[in-house]
Amino acid sequence: MSAGGAGGEAKGAYPQQTLMALGIVGGLVGIYLGHFMPPAYSFFGGIGAICATVWGADAVRRVASYGLGTGVPSIGMLALGMGILAALFGLALGGIAGPILAVVVAAIIGGVIGALANKVIGMGIPIMEQAMIEISCAGTLVILGLSVVIAGSFDYAAIIENVIANGYIALIFIIGGMGILHPFNACLGPDESQDRTLILAVEKAAIALIITGFASSLHEGLMTAGINILVGLVIWYVAFSKYYALIKRDAYAVVGTGLLPSAEELQ
C-alpha cells in the first residue's frame, strides 16, 4: 500500500542543503573514483549511488508530505526514467564530463516536468518544481553509480555494452527506484522521522550495491564482484542494525507474536 503525507511541509534534523551536497558531491566523487580507479574499486560507484539515494529519498519525503497518495511509488519510477535519459545523453556527449553534464540535463528535465505538474496538471504543491529537479538529479546519479559498479567505467561504449544491451539497465531501474521511493512509503505515519526514513534509504541502496555486485561478475571477474558484494553487505548490516534500533526507539512496543494459530485453535 502506498500513501502520501499529512499535507504539509516535512520537518527534519538534516537540512535540505546538506543532503543535496551529500547527493551531488558524494555521488559524483563516487562515480569518478569508480571510473578512474582499478576495477576492484568499482564499488565506489555504488557508494556514490548510496549518497544520491539518500538525497532522492529525502526529496521524495518532502514532496510526498504534501499528500501525493499513490504517487509516491510513481515519483520514484519517474526519477529513474528521467535519470536514464539524462545519463545516456550526458555520457554520449560529455566525455569525461559526462556525469556532470548528465546532472545538468536531469535538472532541466526535472524542472520542466515539475512545472507541468503544477501549472498544467494543477497539483498545487509549492515545492514540486524544486523537488522534481532534485529527484531527477538523484535518479541520474543512482543510474550512473550502479552502472559503474557493473561496467567498471562510465565510458559510453562500456555502459551500452555492459549495462544497456544485456538488459541490466532494467535491474538498475527497479532497485534504484526502490531505494528512492520505498523509504518514505515504509516509514509513513504520525511517528515518521527523517533519520529513520533516510537510514532505510541507505539500507535499500546497499542492497542495490549487492545485486549489482553480482551482476558485475560477468564483466569484471569474480574477485571484483566479491569485493562489491562484501562492501554492500557491510553497509547493509550497519544500516539495517541502525534502522532496527530506530524502530525500537519510535515504536510504542516491540513484541513477538509467535506462530499464527491453526484453524482448530481458532474454533
UniProtKB/Swiss-Prot annotation:
InterPro entries on file: THM_MeTrfase_su_C
Disulfide bond is among the record's keywords: no
Localization (cell): Cell membrane
EC primary class: translocase
Enzyme Commission code(s) on record: 7.2.1.4
Reaction(s) catalysed (UniProt annotation): 5-methyl-5,6,7,8-tetrahydromethanopterin + coenzyme M + 2 Na(+)(in) = 5,6,7,8-tetrahydromethanopterin + methyl-coenzyme M + 2 Na(+)(out)
Transmembrane portions of the chain: 19-39, 40-60, 75-95, 96-116, 140-160, 164-184, 198-218, 221-241
GO molecular function, one term: tetrahydromethanopterin S-methyltransferase activity
BP GO annotations: methanogenesis, from carbon dioxide; methylation; one-carbon metabolic process
Pathway: One-carbon metabolism; methanogenesis from CO(2); methyl-coenzyme M from 5,10-methylene-5,6,7,8-tetrahydromethanopterin: step 2/2
Task of the protein: Part of a complex that catalyzes the formation of methyl-coenzyme M and tetrahydromethanopterin from coenzyme M and methyl-tetrahydromethanopterin. This is an energy-conserving, sodium-ion translocating step.
Family stated for the protein in its record: Belongs to the MtrC family.
NCBIfam families, A to Z: mtrC
Subunit structure, interactors included: The complex is composed of 8 subunits; MtrA, MtrB, MtrC, MtrD, MtrE, MtrF, MtrG and MtrH.
Name assigned to this protein: Tetrahydromethanopterin S-methyltransferase subunit C
Organism expressing this protein natively: Methanosarcina mazei (strain ATCC BAA-159 / DSM 3647 / Goe1 / Go1 / JCM 11833 / OCM 88)
